Amino acid sequence: MGKAKNKKKVLKNKQQVLVPGILFVHPKKGFGFVSPDQPDLYPFDIFVPASDLKGALDGDHVLVALPFSQRGGEKRKGVIHKVLSRGKTVLVGTIISLISPTLAMVCVNAISPEVPLKAELLPKRTYKIGDRLLLKTPGWKENYPSKEPPPLAMLEFMGNISNAKTDFPVIKAEFSITEEFPEAVVQEASQFLQKHVTQALHSRKDLRDLLCFTIDSASAKDFDDAVSLTYDHEGNYILGVHIADVSHYVTPNSALDQEAAKRCNSIYFPGKVIPMLPSALSDNLCSLKPNVDRLAVSVFMTFSKEGFLSDYRILRSVIRSKYRMTYDEVDEIIEKKLAHPISKTILEMAELSRIFSDIREQRGCTRLVLPSFTMSLDNLQEPVALVENKQTAAHKLIEEFMLKANEVIAYHISHQGITMPFRIHEPPNEENLLLFRETAKAMGFTITQTPTQEPDYQYLLQETSAGHPLEPILHSQFVRSMKTASYSTENKGHYGLCLDYYTHFTSPIRRYVDLIVHRLLFHPLSVEEGHLEQIVRACSSQERVAAKAEGAFINIKKARFLKKFLDEQPATLYKAFIITVSPEGLSFVLPELCHEGFIPAAKLPKKYVIKTKLGLEELPEHLLPGIPISVQLASVTLLTQAIEWTLIESKERSSSKKKKAKAKSNATQVKKKSSSKKKKAVSKAKKNRGGK
């Protein structure tokens, strides 16, 4: 009966099909993508221009109208037909002008940062520009916006934007993030004491004498993982990865479990964490602190001297971490700048991680160098420093070991015939890769065409751009051509890692999926297969929400940071690199600030304006991606978080032709170098393929 109705509904308009899904809206540019509810029928996201959102907001459950001609096509561009349910119950607005004591114009980033909306203010209070308000999300109406939408209703006053301490409460409200735990959850967590570890000893492997230790940042509190390294009688590596056994404490359907399932993950802000679990567990009993007994799930993996897996064991254990090491300390040991009782073990671990890294290169895995930074805040929550994060040998060591553990666990559970959550990363669309190839070519780089193109990208990214000033741009553009990694009960492999089996197992303190994977290892019947599908979708969705919340918090803090720069050093010139040029304007990246900016065409010098959209090969050389430019801050408006830039034409600039010729020369040399290296790698990879 239901199917007949659906068919009849489609036939009413033979030109389109209505696809239900979740809408995700770009926070700055305003366009959106709908992730279909039925990925098997529609295995792609549907692009929705800002002009076709029809009043739909980020996170809404919508029906998107997709023309029949595009169902299997390349464009996949749709129009919002209907909002089935709102994703957010509240919005946050900032007053930009007052109409009367009870009516104001507000900027609401979630709806439209460019177009102010009316808001009815609560009485008995004096308001001023910059006041931040909690507003009720408007209901959706057909034919939106056929007339001016009604004023938004104010629910609560949240402070003024001049006070940086209001940023965090605003982000929590905007993204419906709950910080405090319900009393029942706190009580359940507090009932667990150190004696529970002692009581569990009889049913676990006692590894308290094993030399294992944690490696984390200096500020970390929740230690998910510890590592160990020993050898068998043949000299093979035995790598131990020991993960906090959160599943021992958080049992199915308990108050702790239900709350963790709602949160799905911990959310990290500068100087602040919203944990998935109460601190009694996350920072204490589950955290693998040094010199105390802790329950763990230990994975021992035996590797040949060449780094290939020959055996593994998975068991529940009790461990006692011997040291709490920081990344900086481990780096100093690797660089022979620090003597430590475990220096020998760390140096051997570093060698093993390098072997793993080489194997990843051989199979064509893309190693990306993406710009990132840490923002420091003072006691008033004002940003005071922006420090670039660099991936060091210590970071790579832990990354390689965790990748191996996640891969082994995925292989193990899936070969038990158990339905499980995989961490998948599907191959990119060919049209996206084509755009990346064109961008790389315009920057002076060359990618050799082969039947399997992954190694070509890997060698381009690693060899051609290593140490190159355009490295962050090239790598960022490559990431944009990729699909987003997510969770799925269907194993589709991991494109970025070039792995057939991959999951998340190593962070159960901060990720709910990892906790589920732990349960599947020892109590698979405790996870209902039907419920698992819901968990997977919820965790993928909440992961996006967390990323948006973290990004929104960084954006307002960065606006404050740049405003301070503008006030104190208004004449400062910043070196930037062009990303794209269009009739709308010019977008660029500032590596030193880890920031992307945009200058509209109306504010550009004439030589930087194009009237029609041009292919990369048609652009003048001074407009090509990667060309350096100088920019200056023009204005920073906290009310709307708008950051405006001015392009400053440099009097002395080296010829772009010379730079392009040099880049091409470099690319040719790398091409020759990588070609012979690739042949050796492919030969070696084929020889060792049966190692696992």
Swiss-Prot record:
A GO cellular component annotation here is: cytosol
**Ranges of residues in domain S1 motif:** 563-648
Write down the top EC class of this protein.
hydrolase
Which Pfam families does this entry report, sorted A to Z? OB_RNB, RNB
UniProt domain RNB: residue ranges: 204-525
SMART domains tied to this protein: CSP, RNB
Location of the protein in the cell: Cytoplasm
Keywords (alphabetical) are: Cytoplasm, Exonuclease, Hydrolase, Nuclease, RNA-binding
Q: Which GO terms describe its biological process?
A: mRNA catabolic process
- What Enzyme Commission number(s) apply to this enzyme? 3.1.13.1
Q: What ranges does the record list as Basic residues composition bias?
A: 670-692
Enumerate the catalysed reactions.
Exonucleolytic cleavage in the 3'- to 5'-direction to yield nucleoside 5'-phosphates
Matches recorded under InterPro entries: CSD, NA-bd_OB-fold, RNase_B_OB_dom, RNase_II/R, RNase_II/R_CS, RNase_II/RNase_R, RNase_R, RNR_Ribonuclease
Gene3D superfamilies referenced in this protein's UniProt entry, alphabetically: Nucleic acid-binding proteins (2.40.50.140)
Q: Which GO terms describe its molecular function?
A: exoribonuclease II activity; RNA binding
Region entry Disordered, spans: 651-692
As for what it does, the entry says: 3'-5' exoribonuclease that releases 5'-nucleoside monophosphates and is involved in maturation of structured RNAs.
Protein family per UniProt? Belongs to the RNR ribonuclease family. RNase R subfamily.
Which protein are we looking at? Answer: Ribonuclease R
